[in-house]
Amino acid sequence: VENNLYGVDLDERAVQLTQIALFIKAMQLKGRRGAMPTYTHVVSTHFELPEYSKVKGAFISGSDWNETQQKTIHSIWEDLRAAYKFGSLIRVEEQLDALLPVDSSDMFANQWKADMFDFKHQMITTLRNQVHQWTGEGSNEYSLAKANDSITFLDILRTKFDVAVANPPYTDSADFGAELKDFVSANYYKPLKFNSNLYACFIKRCCELAGDDGKVGMIHPMTFMYIKTFEDVRKYILTNTHINLFVEYGLSNLFGTVMVDPAFYVLEKDGGTKNNDSLFISLDQYTRTPQEKYKKQYCLEALNDIVTKSQNKHVYQLPQSKLKGIKSYPFIYWISDEFREKFSDKLLDDVVDVKQGI
């Protein structure tokens, strides 16, 4: 709990409940594990920071930072000010990495990297001090807790994890408010588009937070599997990760009385796994049928059969490279290779002009 688990949420109450649950679990394991944890790294982003003009002097005083570096500091501070709205979608390390030279063969590249390391170290140190100062003003326990949360949050944004998991919010781009729309456009629109739904942004963010050999676990609506507007999301997954396991669960009351339409999956960033087959579990065919209530049972049986290397009619196995064989990369995993090859043939549109009418 103290050294391996980290978490971020906008909702302060959700964070408090999670902290309580972790302590209860720790109490249950105390007999086997020994000492109880004294704190957690599960934090809320419900803290506020002042306008940059009030802290600008602390950042640039005595520094020789150029205009680009100063703009980066300003941008990062403004993003942190919006943490209570955007949470872990804020990208600190990525903005700093953008200052590094693209061409590593450049004769000055190593010097630039050394200068950037010094800049990052100095900037982060000042940033931590300023965040702690402004969020921790006052001696009351709540202010001090918020100060610690803000520093932990900043550390989380700069850390690479072995595993990153999320059950992200589901908000269609048409329902983005003006602020969220601008934030997503600035951070998750180029070079690939992750702006179709808020959960798509979290797919990208979790992959960024996971280390080079890390894993990503997600659960969210399965709309991204086929729809054209999620093409870049699928392209990113197939290009940058390996699909270890993917469950197409479909509409169900997976979370009690709330009906959801989820897919859940595990991605691996380890390049050595990309040649391994991907495993898919298909359960959506039971949606709105008498067998719908058995989905959970079928899923658990399929997972067990995967572990024991037994046959299961719900499990499909294939190299994920085959998913690239159809235009826009839909996650169509259940068709035969022969049928898949037909998608590489000429389209009717390529041969004749299709017209309406007789």
In which residue ranges do the predicted regions lie?
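Signature of N6-adenine DNA methyltransferases within the class I
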Residues: 10, 15, 19-40, 44, ...
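Class I S-adenosyl-L-methionine-dependent methyltransferase module
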Residues: 1-154, 158-159
